[in-house]
């Protein structure tokens, strides 16, 4: 089977590549990858090349396919797997394999990654339960289950303690105060959505950022009134220019501090602020992954000793987290499409990945069977004045107030003749 992929050849070197895949073994799957949402972690891998902990050497001869937030359709089933999978079945990939090497899809494999028209899912990924049946029909939601899975996993990884009781209580504090720092970006939107609609029931959620445009957009998507209807106080705060943001934010809790804090940017000042905002037994989750292996920040160890403050760091999520993300999306409790601001085809991947931090907006969603430059959804109407494809896409997203949706996805895929398989029960 001939495939077309976006692959990492070295530091800051991402190229399109077209080649013949080898025949699958009896314990492998050949799949068509319909969609892949671009993760900042992919940019980090492209930036560092083989210096990245998950990226192997010899990229020039064995380039690795980018992308891991993907979903698609099974095309061919190895003969030893026919009792579990069938041709035409839709799937979503759980890329967190948990291998000692750190290897996973989108970082480490020549034939296994989300930015591909076709890829081979290896035996090890299948044995680890990384191929989940997808019973829905909206591939964007399936791709976005992976970033939502990471967000959900972070909430589950936080913990709290009772003095002289030597078992941690996992998860955020019920009825507690949550602070989401640097959290008006694409992943932040998912974190706010889960805090409000994921059933964890904090009493207060404070969202902090310094980008007023991003804050205004997320307030439209997740208004304070929605949170209030669920018994949650939601507060959006722009700390840019504040003389003492810590004092202001602590005042929102009566100076008690925050029980659970999630840091969504690897910026020393943000981590230091999080430390100062912790309540007694407060848990700081360092969600953002730094590229600097020597990233260090001062931390108040007086409070660690006397106030039981503590830190966790999370990357990825479990299969159960992924299943929760899919289920909450299917019922409409979570709206992962809120994160998406740009749509593109496979041809757009190299430039998108290499310039990701400099492209404004939220998640960039790629359809591998489509040829299309990366385009902001907000620009569809203008482009539609001269291009009938964008004219119809603009009409379809207008029905959901500018949010990407299943109808728009189906129309786009149909225009390029992409086979979307079937939902196998």
Annotate each PLM feature:
Residues 175-177, 181, 192-270, 393:
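Adenosine-nucleotide cofactor-binding segment
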Residues 278-280:
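Helix-to-beta-strand junctions that scaffold the AdoMet/dcAdoMet cofactor pocket
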Residues 269-272, 276, 288-308:
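Rossmann-fold NAD(P)-binding glycine/threonine-rich loop
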Residues 22-37, 51-100, 113, 125, ...:
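Glycine-rich beta-strand-centered segment in the early N-terminal region that forms part
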Residues 95-177:
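NAD(P)H dinucleotide-binding glycine-rich loop of Rossmann-like/cofactor-binding domains
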Residues 1-66, 400-425:
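Short N-terminal strand-loop motif that marks the start
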Residues 162, 220, 243-250, 256, ...:
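C-terminal hydrophobic helical "lid"/dimerization subdomain
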Residues 186-187, 214:
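Hydrophobic/small residue at the entry helix of a nucleotide-binding pocket
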């Amino acid at each position: 089977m001939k495939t077309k992929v976006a692959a990492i050849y070295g530091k800051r070197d991402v190229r399109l590549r077209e080649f013949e895949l080898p025949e699958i073994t009896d314990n492998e799957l050949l799949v068509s990858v319909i969609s892949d949402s671009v993760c900042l972690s992919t940019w980090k891998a492209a930036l560092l090349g083989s210096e990245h902990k998950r990226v192997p050497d010899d990229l020039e001869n064995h380039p690795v396919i980018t992308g891991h937030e993907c979903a698609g359709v099974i095309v061919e089933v190895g003969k030893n797997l026919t009792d579990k999978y069938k041709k035409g079945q839709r799937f979503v990939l759980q890329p967190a394999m948990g291998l000692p090497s750190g290897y996973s899809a989108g970082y480490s494999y020549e034939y296994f990654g989300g930015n591909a028209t076709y890829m081979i899912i290896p035996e090890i990924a299948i044995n680890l339960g990384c191929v989940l049946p997808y019973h829905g029909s909206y591939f964007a939601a399936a791709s976005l289950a992976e970033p939502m899975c990471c967000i959900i996993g972070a909430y589950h990884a936080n913990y709290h303690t009772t003095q002289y009781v030597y078992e941690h209580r996992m998860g955020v504090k019920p009825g507690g105060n949550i602070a989401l720092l640097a959290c008006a970006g694409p992943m932040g939107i998912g974190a706010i959505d889960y805090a409000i609609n994921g059933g964890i029931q904090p009493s207060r959620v404070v969202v902090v950022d310094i980008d007023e445009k991003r804050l205004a957009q997320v307030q439209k998507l997740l208004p304070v009134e929605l949170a209030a209807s669920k018994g949650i106080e939601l507060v959006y705060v722009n700390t840019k220019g504040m003389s003492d943001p810590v004092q202001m934010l602590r005042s929102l809790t009566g100076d008690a501090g925050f029980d659970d804090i999630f840091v969504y940017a690897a910026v020393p000042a943000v981590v230091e602020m999080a430390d100062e905002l912790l309540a007694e037994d407060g848990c700081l989750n360092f969600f953002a992954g730094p590229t600097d292996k020597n990233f260090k920040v001062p931390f108040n160890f007086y409070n660690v000793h006397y106030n039981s403050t503590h830190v966790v760091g999370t990357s990825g999520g479990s299969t159960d987290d992924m299943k929760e993300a899919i289920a909450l999306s299917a019922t409409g409790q979570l709206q992962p499409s809120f994160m998406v601001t740009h749509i593109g085809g496979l041809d757009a991947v190299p430039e998108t990945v290499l310039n990701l931090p400099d492209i404004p907006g939220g998640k960039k969603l790629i359809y591998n069977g489509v040829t299309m430059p990366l385009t902001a959804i907000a620009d569809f109407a203008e482009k539609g004045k001269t291009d009938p494809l964008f004219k119809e896409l603009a009409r379809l997203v207008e029905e959901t107030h500018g949010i990407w949706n299943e109808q728009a996805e189906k129309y786009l895929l149909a225009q390029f003749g992409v086979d979307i398989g079937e939902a196998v029960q």
